[in-house]
C-alpha cells in the first residue's frame, strides 16, 4: 500500500471516528512549495459533510494522523489545507524500492492482459500527409504506448480512404497532364506526385468554371458541367463497375502514395499493426442495418431508405442506408467496427478513434447506434478528439497547394536544430553522421513535444522556432537535461551502494516526491486519453532535477553515502525521463 493510500484510509477512519461520516472522495496532493510539509489534505470539500471550521477539522485530522501513521512526523494547518511532514526514512525506503525497478511506473503485458484497438492517421490517398496528420499520428501512437504501459495489449490500425471522387480527381489530372510521369522519372515521393495532380485538377476545374460562367452559365451549373469534373465522375463510375484499365491506374497511383506514406511514417517514428482500406470495407455494414431493422432499432421510410431516430437522446434522425440500397459513412463505420472487434481481434474490449473535433457529432451517433444494437463493447469506444493545428500565419488548404507538408516540416525542424546546435558549438568530437543523427533527434523531439504537451482538445499554434528553444517547456530543454545526467553517470563510473538511512537534503526530498508521482501520472494519462499529462510531468521532473543540480554537489560531495544517493537519484531521474519520452515517441540523446 502506498503512503497516499495509507493517508487516505486513516483520514477516512479519523472522519468516521470524530464526525460519524463516511467520506470516499478525499483529495491528497503534494504540498505547494510555499508551505511547509510534504503531502496536503484539502479540507474545503469536507465542509459539505462536516459542520465545523476547516482549521478545527485540520487540527483533529492532523493529530490523528500523527498518532496513527508512523511516517507522519508533524503537521500544520493553513486556511483550508492540512500539510503533513513525512519522515526521511519513508522517502529513503520508497526510493530504495523504485531504484532497482526496470521501467518504473509501467505495468508489464501478460497473457491475461486486456486488449484495445487504437486507430489513427487514416489519410486520403490523393495527397501527402500534412501538419494536421502529424498531430493525429503523434496522439494515436503515443496513446497506444501509454495504454501498453498500463498493461494493455494494443493493436494499432488505420483505415486508408483509397476510393471515391477525390482519388479520381488526381487520376484524371494525371491522365490529362501527366505525360507518363512516375516517382522514379521525377524524383518526387509518390504521395507528392499524386498530390501535385490533385492541385492541378483543382486549378483546371476553376478555370473551366470561370469559362462556363463567362459563357452565361450559373455558378451551380458550371460546377456540375465543367468537363474535367464530368470526366472524374465518369472515372468513379468506371471504378465502381470494375473497369480493368481504371482499376489498374487506381492501384498504380495508390501504390505510389503508400510508398510515400511509408517514408513519412518511418521518419515520424510511428507504425501500425494492421491497415484497412475503404475499398475493402465500404460495402460492410449492410448486414448490421438488416439486423437493426429486425431488432426495431432502425426503421424504413416510404422511399425505402433506412433511418434511426435519436431525438430522445438529444441527437437527430440519422440516415443509415440510402433508398437505392447504397451505404453512407456511418454504415461503413458500423461494419468496420464490428468486423474489427467481432472477427479480426475477438479478445479486444474497446477501441479509440483518433479523429479531429469536426467529427465529434459523427462519433456520438456511431457509438450510440452500436450501444442500441446491443454490442457490449460499444461502451468502451472512445473518440480521441483533437483541435486544429495552425502555423503563425494561419490554417492551410490542400486543393490550393498551400498545405503545410509533413515531410517538409520535419526537415525544417532538423534544419533549425542544426543551426541552433552549431550556434551553441558543443559538438566537438562528433562525426558528421553523429551530428546529423543528433539534429534529427533534437528537431523531431522538439516537434513531437510541442504538439503532445498541449491538451488534445485545445487548438495549437505551432511555432517551429519556439518549439526548439533550449530553455523552457520544450523537448530540447528536457533532452539536454537527460544528456547532462548521462554525463554525470559516465563520470561517476560504477554505481555505488545505495544508502538505506540518513538525513535528506530538502532538494533530495522534493526529487523523490516528484518521482513518486510517475506511476499515477501514467495511469491518469491512460484514463483521460491525454499524453499531455506525461509531457508536462516530465517537464516538472526536469525542473526539479535542475534545481537539485544547482543546489547540491553530486560528484563533488565528500560524504560517501550522500554522494551515492545523489548519483542514484540522478540515474533514476534519467530513466524516468527516458521512459516518459518513450511513451511520447521521443528519443533522448546520450550526449548533446
Task: Map each language-model feature to its residues.
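Flexible, low-complexity linker/hinge segments
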Residues: 100-111
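Non-catalytic interaction-recognition regions
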Residues: 1-92, 110-592
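Short, charged, solvent-exposed linker or helix-capping segments at domain edges/interfaces
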Residues: 93-99
Amino acid at each position: 500500500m502506498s503512503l497516499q493510500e495509507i493517508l487516505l484510509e486513516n483520514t477516512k477512519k479519523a472522519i468516521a471516528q470524530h464526525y460519524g461520516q463516511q467520506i470516499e472522495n478525499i483529495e491528497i496532493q503534494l504540498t505547494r512549495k510555499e508551505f511547509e510539509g510534504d503531502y496536503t489534505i484539502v479540507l474545503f470539500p469536507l465542509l459539505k459533510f462536516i459542520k465545523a471550521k476547516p482549521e478545527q477539522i485540520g487540527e483533529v485530522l492532523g493529530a490523528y494522523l500523527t498518532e496513527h501513521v508512523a511516517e507522519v512526523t508533524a503537521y500544520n494547518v493553513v486556511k483550508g489545507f492540512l500539510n503533513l511532514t513525512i519522515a526521511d526514512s519513508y522517502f529513503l525506503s520508497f526510493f530504495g524500492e523504485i531504484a532497482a525497478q526496470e521501467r518504473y511506473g509501467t505495468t508489464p503485458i501478460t497473457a491475461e492482459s486486456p486488449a484495445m484497438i487504437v486507430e489513427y492517421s487514416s489519410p486520403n490517398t490523393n495527397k501527402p500527409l500534412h501538419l494536421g496528420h502529424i498531430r493525429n499520428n503523434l496522439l494515436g501512437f503515443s496513446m497506444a504506448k501509454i495504454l501498453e504501459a498500463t498493461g494493455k495489449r494494443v493493436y494499432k490500425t488505420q483505415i486508408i480512404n483509397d476510393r471515391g471522387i477525390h482519388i479520381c480527381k488526381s487520376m484524371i489530372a494525371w491522365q490529362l497532364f501527366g505525360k507518363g510521369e512516375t516517382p522514379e522519372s521525377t524524383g518526387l515521393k509518390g504521395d507528392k506526385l499524386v498530390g501535385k495532380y490533385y492541385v492541378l485538377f483543382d486549378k483546371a476545374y476553376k478555370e473551366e468554371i470561370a469559362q462556363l460562367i463567362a459563357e452565361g452559365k450559373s455558378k451551380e451549373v458550371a460546377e456540375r458541367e465543367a468537363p474535367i469534373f464530368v470526366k472524374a465522375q465518369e472515372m468513379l463510375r468506371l471504378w465502381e463497375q470494375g473497369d480493368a484499365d481504371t482499376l489498374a491506374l487506381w492501384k498504380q497511383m495508390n501504390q505510389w502514395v503508400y510508398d510515400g506514406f511509408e517514408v513519412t511514417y518511418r521518419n515520424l517514428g510511428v507504425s501500425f499493426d494492421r491497415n484497412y482500406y475503404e475499398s475493402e470495407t465500404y460495402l460492410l455494414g449492410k448486414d448490421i442495418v438488416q439486423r437493426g431493422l429486425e431488432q426495431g432499432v432502425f426503421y424504413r421510410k416510404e422511399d425505402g431508405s433506412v433511418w434511426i431516430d435519436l431525438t430522445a437522446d438529444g441527437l437527430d434522425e440519422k440516415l443509415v442506408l440510402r433508398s437505392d440500397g447504397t451505404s453512407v459513412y456511418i454504415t461503413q463505420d458500423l461494419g468496420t467496427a464490428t468486423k474489427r472487434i467481432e472477427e479480426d481481434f475477438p479478445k479486444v474490449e474497446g477501441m479509440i478513434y483518433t479523429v479531429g473535433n469536426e467529427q465529434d457529432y459523427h462519433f456520438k451517433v456511431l457509438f450510440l447506434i452500436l450501444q442500441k444494437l446491443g454490442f457490449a463493447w460499444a461502451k468502451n469506444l472512445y473518440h480521441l478528439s483533437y483541435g486544429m493545428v495552425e502555423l503563425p500565419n494561419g490554417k492551410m488548404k490542400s486543393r490550393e497547394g498551400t498545405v503545410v507538408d509533413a515531410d517538409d516540416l520535419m526537415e525544417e525542424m532538423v534544419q533549425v536544430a542544426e543551426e541552433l546546435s552549431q550556434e551553441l558549438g558543443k559538438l566537438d568530437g562528433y562525426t558528421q553522421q553523429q551530428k546529423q543523427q543528433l539534429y534529427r533527434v533534437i528537431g523531431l523531439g522538439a516537434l513531437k513535444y510541442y504538439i503532445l504537451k498541449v491538451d488534445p482538445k485545445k487548438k495549437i499554434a505551432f511555432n517551429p522556432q519556439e518549439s526548439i528553444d533550449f530553455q523552457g517547456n520544450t523537448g530540447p530543454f528536457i533532452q539536454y537535461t537527460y544528456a547532462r545526467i548521462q554525463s554525470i553517470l559516465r563520470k561517476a563510473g560504477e554505481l555505488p551502494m545505495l544508502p538505506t538511512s540518513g538525513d535528506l537534503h530538502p532538494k533530495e526530498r522534493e526529487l523523490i516526491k516528484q518521482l513518486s508521482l510517475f506511476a499515477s501520472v501514467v495511469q491518469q494519462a491512460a484514463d483521460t486519453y491525454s499524453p499531455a499529462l506525461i509531457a508536462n510531468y516530465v517537464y516538472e521532473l526536469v525542473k526539479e532535477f535542475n534545481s537539485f543540480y544547482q543546489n547540491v554537489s553530486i560528484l563533488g560531495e565528500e560524504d560517501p553515502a550522500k554522494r551515492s544517493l545523489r548519483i542514484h537519484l540522478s540515474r533514476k531521474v534519467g530513466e524516468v525521463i527516458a521512459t516518459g519520452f518513450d511513451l511520447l515517441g521521443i528519443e533522448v540523446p546520450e550526449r548533446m
